[in-house]
Design a protein with these regions (language model features):
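Hydrophobic faces of well-ordered beta-strands that scaffold small-molecule active sites
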Residues: 1-5, 32, 36, 71-74, ...
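Active-site entrance/lid segments in N-terminal catalytic domains of soluble metabolic enzymes
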Residues: 1-86
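Short glycine/serine/threonine-rich phosphate/pyrophosphate-binding segments
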Residues: 81-83, 105-106, 161-165
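Alpha/beta catalytic cores of nucleotide-metabolism and tRNA/nucleoside-modifying enzymes
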Residues: 122-154, 160-217
């Protein structure tokens, strides 16, 4: 169980010298660590979004120095580019969560809340990003870097089924798991039994895939 904060909130706490509040929050929640989400495009397109004044990378480094618990860094719909991935892999993070392009487009959802002029002119920006497949390829290239300290990734964003998850985790050269959100959330609106049945089918499908399928090199 991980707590969750945005990098914008981390920035505010750093500026007010109140990072100890994060430690208190994680302790009070009995969480195993903290997920920090970085979503610059979403913030820029959100009518009341927070615009970062410090480098998110610098803020994460400060957080790693001050906080004793595991930290996961994630994107929220656009994914990370190669330079961001390179820098993050070199940090002692518990994991990097892709939050790749192809899943729920939170930047677009925020833009739809803006005025008509903003929607008409800024909409192309909402579709900029990297897919999970592209990010796996980037990670594979960067995996040879001996300076890497982060050894785990969570492949998320546009993962529709167990076949997507099996393919992407098999393709990835470093330790990886995959995550799905949209399909689970849709079923979560129904009964627990429906959600559990779907989850069991996904697990079974993944097990079958691991036994019978091999990806093409």
């Amino acid at each position: 169980l991980f707590a969750n904060l945005g990098i914008a909130q981390i920035e505010q706490l750093v500026e007010s010298q109140s990072l100890s509040l994060i430690d208190k929050m994680v302790t009070k929640l009995q969480a195993d660590g903290l997920i920090v989400h970085i979503n610059p495009m979403q913030e820029w397109l959100q009518p009341e979004g927070d615009i970062y004044t410090h480098s998110p990378l610098d803020l994460i480094k400060i957080l790693l120095e001050k906080c004793p618990f595991p930290i996961i860094v994630k994107e929220v719909g656009q994914g990370f580019g190669p330079e961001s991935l390179r820098s993050l892999l070199e940090l002692p993070l518990a994991a990097i969560d892709f939050g790749a392009s192809g899943g729920t487009n939170f930047a677009l959802l925020e833009l739809l809340r803006a005025n008509q002029t903003a929607q008409e002119n800024l909409s192309p920006l909402a579709y900029i990003g990297h897919t999970a497949h592209e990010m796996v390829e980037m990670v594979n290239v960067l995996s040879e870097n001996t300076a890497n300290q982060c050894k785990h990734v969570i492949i998320s964003g546009g993962v529709k089924t167990f076949l997507d998850g099996y393919y992407l985790t098999s393709k990835c050269k470093i330790s990886s798991i995959y995550a799905q959100a949209s399909s689970f959330l849709k079923l979560a609106l129904g009964t627990y039994e429906e959600l559990d049945a779907y989850m069991q089918i996904q697990i079974k499908g993944l097990s079958i895939s691991k036994q019978f399928l091999r990806i093409k090199s």
